[in-house]
Amino acid sequence: MSYKRKETGKLGEELAAEYLKGMGYRIIQTNCRLPEGEIDIVGQDGECLAFIEVRTKRRLEYGLPAESITLRKKAHLIASAESYMQKYHLEHLPCRIDFVSVDLSQPEPKLELIKNALGEE
């Protein structure tokens, strides 16, 4: 991954964390690495544990940020969330996977939250 892509991703994750806090989320952990993959943000929304994938784009020629989530990435997100829940003994909590789309193609960043993005809780 190029330096510029890493910096774009890091900026997107920082913007997303602040955005989520403003939406009432409590940020528990960022950049959580597990054998199954990385979880960008682990947060709590009310009683629900949220595993948040952040997608950031500077240019939209190839689609919106949320459209870049592949089936393989979805499978990794599910496996990572399950692993996190087991590791921290949180299986009793309701959970979901959310996406935050960060569009940096305009002078002002545009963020969008998609709760329960995979349609399962």
Curated annotation (Swiss-Prot):
InterPro entries: Restrct_endonuc-II-like (IPR011335), tRNA_endonuc-like_dom_sf (IPR011856), UPF0102_YraN-like (IPR003509). One of its GO terms (molecular function) is nucleic acid binding. It comes from the Bacteria. Gene3D superfamilies: 3.40.1350.10. Belongs to the UPF0102 family. NCBIfam families: PRK12497.1-3 (NF009150), PRK14688.1 (NF011280), YraN family protein (TIGR00252). This is UPF0102 protein DET0781.
